[in-house]
Amino acid sequence: MVYIHFPNNLTEEEQMLQAKYQKLKKKKKALQAHKAPKPEPESSLTLKRPTDARDAREVARKLIKSGAIPAIQKQTKQDQTSFKRPKGQERAKRSTSETTVASYQPFSSTQNDVAQETIISEIIKEEPRRQNLYQHFATERDREERGMPEKVPMDTAQPEKPRAGNTIFVSGNKVTEDFLKKTFNDYGTIVNVSMEIEKSRGFVSFAKPESADRAIAEIHGKNVNGINLQVQLARRQPQIEPINDASSSAVWSSIAASKSQKGSHKDHREMVQYDEDFLL
């Protein structure tokens, strides 16, 4: 068997380790004590003895008699009613006062001359209105008795008629008179072609407005021979007389021949004759 002999005295290394261990142990205890929550000290509640109402009254009376405290004065009715009126009620009061019509009160002591003048001026203003109303109703009744139709108000908005005309406005790059004649010859009889060469635009006048409408609908915004054409109805339409219109001369001459100058109106009244004695 082998016996191990431990010396009683510690070596220098062991003593150094033991001292470090003791230091760490102290630090650990101090850290735990710092982290632990500290119990808050109980606050001592000071209980006040409630005073009796009778005792308070007696103390107040004694102080008033001695002159240390002034007595409380009662408020009068005027002080109680003097409150600030809200702004909303003031506005409502103003509006009602403005809308009310002044009326004459002969037995009122507060009636003044200004109110009377305003009433008289209002009565004077009302008189022409009443006369106009009377005239209006009188004329309406008279029209009903005669059986005349009611007047149609002129203010009624009538729908605007669509624009129509024989002349169209054509614009495009390098547009010429021959080009316009060739392009629009298929849509109807061309009466006149006028050009503005500097601005590359022109005006084409057809014999009928239907030809102008068809040309606008089919050619506006399209490319013809590499030229983008903008076709619109011209603002100013020159007056063009219809060509080869059969109803222009023959029809109107027949109508004029069938009607006499006196017209077809016959007078159905009877002739009234008076005696000579009645006239004298």
UniProtKB/Swiss-Prot annotation:
An annotated GO cellular component: chromosome
Q: Where is the composition biased (Polar residues)?
A: 73-83, 97-112
* Bridged cysteine pairs (disulfide): none
Statement: the UniProt record of this protein carries the keyword Repressor: yes
Q: What InterPro entries does the record tag this protein with?
A: NELFE (IPR033102), NELFE_RRM (IPR034637), Nucleotide-bd_a/b_plait_sf (IPR012677), RBD_domain_sf (IPR035979), RRM_dom (IPR000504)
**Comp. bias (Basic and acidic residues):** 49-61, 87-96, 141-163
RRM domain span: 166-236
The protein's matches in Pfam families, at most eight in alphabetical order, are given as:
RRM_1
What keywords sit in the KW lines?
Chromosome, Nucleus, Repressor, RNA-binding, Transcription, Transcription regulation
Q: Where in the cell is it found?
A: Nucleus; Chromosome
GO BP term (any one): negative regulation of transcription elongation by RNA polymerase II
* Protein's job: Essential component of the NELF complex, a complex that negatively regulates the elongation of transcription by RNA polymerase II by RNA polymerase II. The NELF complex, which acts via an association with the DSIF complex, causes transcriptional pausing.
> Hey, which family's this protein in?
Belongs to the RRM NELF-E family.
Q: What quaternary structure, including any partners, is listed in this protein's UniProt entry?
A: Component of the NELF complex, which is at least composed of TH1/Nelf-D and Nelf-E.
Output this protein's name: Negative elongation factor E
- Say which species the protein is native to: Drosophila melanogaster (Fruit fly)
Provide the gene name from the record: Nelf-E
